[in-house]
Amino acid sequence: GRPLATSNLPLRAGKGHNYEGGIKVPLFVVWEDKIKKGLSNTLVTGTDHFPTLLDLVGIKLMNDKHLDGISFKNSLMGKFQDNSKRPVFWHSPRPRPKSTGDLANTTVRLGDFKLLDFYREGRIELYNLMEDQGETNDLSDIMPQKRDELYEMVKNWRKSVDATE
């Protein structure tokens, strides 16, 4: 294979990929006298920042305007925040096989599981991120029920947002 521009070992791949090495990034938040120092494993995406800022300053969300993202205020305040039932989607319709080596795909993360649908190749990969953070053990043939559940979510989400293939 070609050398990657980045290395996020032990995570798989790097910038431009929907594997963990390309999408998992640290988030640091500092607010003196408001947020206690600590560490959280709460799953957060970029769309969660705006609802969180509104929540922190006491402004109510307008559901017709704030369609994406959820507040992670509870996590910042040191309270448990269970996002395990919340699906998070990524869509990358423009492959870059020569620059980053990635292929067009739609990805969903739900709890510990992550499914990548390489729709142009007709290939699906399924991983349990709690047991396999490096995404080396494809479970799509071993866990067909979980694969099919997440694949249906991907298809429905793509249709709901009119995602291009």
How would you describe each model-predicted region?
Residues 24:
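Conserved nucleotide-sugar donor-binding catalytic segment
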Residues 132:
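Intrinsically disordered, low-complexity polar regions and short flexible loop motifs
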Residues 1-20, 34-36, 42, 47-129, ...:
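C-terminal cap/loop subdomain of S1 sulfatases and analogous C-terminal strand-loop tails that border
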Residues 55, 78, 142, 153-156:
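Residues within well-ordered alpha-helical secondary structure of globular protein domains
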Residues 27-29:
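Short glycine- and hydrophobic/aromatic-rich loop-to-beta-strand nucleating segment
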Residues 137-145:
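Active-site-proximal N-terminal segment of extracellular/periplasmic enzymes that hydrolyze or transfer
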Residues 149-165:
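Charge-dense polyanion-binding interfaces
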Residues 84, 146-148:
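Cytochrome P450 catalytic domain signature, combining two hallmark sequence patches
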